[in-house]
Amino acid sequence: MVINTTDPEERVINLSFVLGFIKEIFGLIWIRIYILIPILGVLIGLLVIVWLERKISAGIQQRIGPEYAGPLGILQALADGIKLLLKEDIIPSRGDLWLFSIGPAIVVIPILSSYLVIPFGRHIVLADLSIGVFFRIAVSSIAPLGLLMAGYGSNNKYSFSGGLRAAAQSISYEIPLALCVLSISLLSNSLGTVDIVEAQSRYGFWGWNLWRQPIGFIAFFISSLAECERLPFDLPEAEEELVAGYQTEYSGIKFGLFYVASYLNLLASSLFVTILYLGGWNFSIPSIPISEYFEWDSINGTSEVLGITMGILITLAKAYLFLFISITARWTLPRMRIDQLLDLGWKFLLPIALGNLLLTASFQLLLL
């Protein structure tokens, strides 16, 4: 019996049927594997980001950084996570228990949901939605509601001020983000993440939206940093002004959820910058025809595995470049005031993103 399908999942299921397994049971197992692998990948990526930030920050400040927990301190993030799990979970006596407890979950769940539409290859995406990029913007706008609930439920003036700042900051920078995504969608004729990457691959390296939309890239880059609440945009948790902002009353696992959500959001934003502006999983470097050797081949299994691996590595390499820039900006730029942050969003980024959208639409109409 010869099995030859274009779908790797079908090939494995059919092989299991030949070996005597029940096809339905193996299908359920395969679904669980599909869910488990992305979760493990995200957790490993989270640990790597925390370690990289500590090492890069230490290098900028001429320190050694973590070095005792594992080789080169690679297990330091894991040790910190275990410490948070073992800490006591303290709840304010005069706070709102329901809002205080559900706030961290509302922050984490939408950020995790955005990973559903992130492609690491032509066939490596959990949900290839036709509105993938807008799905990311929609779910990311839910997170500030959790921050506002956490700040209000803490019954603390610093926490409440941090929650209000998070809501104001999100509203200010979600609109420029959406306008930049609309410009990309006009160029690609699609809102799907896979289609946007495929549209960039038609013209190679110079087809990246980074070159076709330089103004939009700058606006998207700044808005992404503000959405992640990274310095110089970490006003909701400014230590010198608000102690720790909406995190002031939190400890233990609930504080750990905010910590995880911050880095997950940074990783998701880096991956979306890669998908929208840097060609996604395509190598696309002139004079290096790497794509010819790693095509999606349904017959040659080795070539298929290498192609998948190369796509994942290329996507992560581009994303970690954005991460490096974000971490470096944390230690090189001073924090803005809240009025300066809102002015930047409403008076600078919004007009630029809107003008970029109008220019893109005009050029697309001329090309019809």
UniProtKB/Swiss-Prot annotation:
Annotated signal peptide: none
Listed GO CC annotations: chloroplast thylakoid membrane
Membrane topology: Multi-pass membrane protein
EC number per UniProt: 7.1.1.-
Pfam families assigned: NADHdh
The entry's keywords: Chloroplast, Membrane, NAD, NADP, Plastid, Plastoquinone, Quinone, Thylakoid, Translocase, Transmembrane, Transmembrane helix
Main localisation: plastid
One annotated GO biological process: aerobic respiration
Domain of life: Eukaryota
Catalytic reaction equation(s): a plastoquinone + NADH + (n+1) H(+)(in) = a plastoquinol + NAD(+) + n H(+)(out); a plastoquinone + NADPH + (n+1) H(+)(in) = a plastoquinol + NADP(+) + n H(+)(out)
InterPro entries: NADH_UbQ_OxRdtase_su1/FPO (IPR001694), NADH_UbQ_OxRdtase_su1_CS (IPR018086)
Location in the cell: Plastid, Chloroplast thylakoid membrane
Parts forming coiled coils: none
GO molecular function, one term: oxidoreductase activity, acting on NAD(P)H, quinone or similar compound as acceptor
Parts of the chain that traverse the membrane: 11-31, 33-53, 98-118, 131-151, 177-197, 205-225, 255-275, 305-325, 348-368
NCBIfam families given in the database record: PRK06076.1-2
HAMAP family in the cross-refs: NDH1_NuoH
Entry-linked PANTHER family: NADH DEHYDROGENASE SUBUNIT 1, NADH-UBIQUINONE OXIDOREDUCTASE CHAIN 1
Subunit field text: NDH is composed of at least 16 different subunits, 5 of which are encoded in the nucleus.
Reported function: NDH shuttles electrons from NAD(P)H:plastoquinone, via FMN and iron-sulfur (Fe-S) centers, to quinones in the photosynthetic chain and possibly in a chloroplast respiratory chain. The immediate electron acceptor for the enzyme in this species is believed to be plastoquinone. Couples the redox reaction to proton translocation, and thus conserves the redox energy in a proton gradient.
Assigned protein family: Belongs to the complex I subunit 1 family.
Protein's recorded name: NAD(P)H-quinone oxidoreductase subunit 1, chloroplastic
Organism of this sequence: Cycas taitungensis
Gene of this entry: ndhA
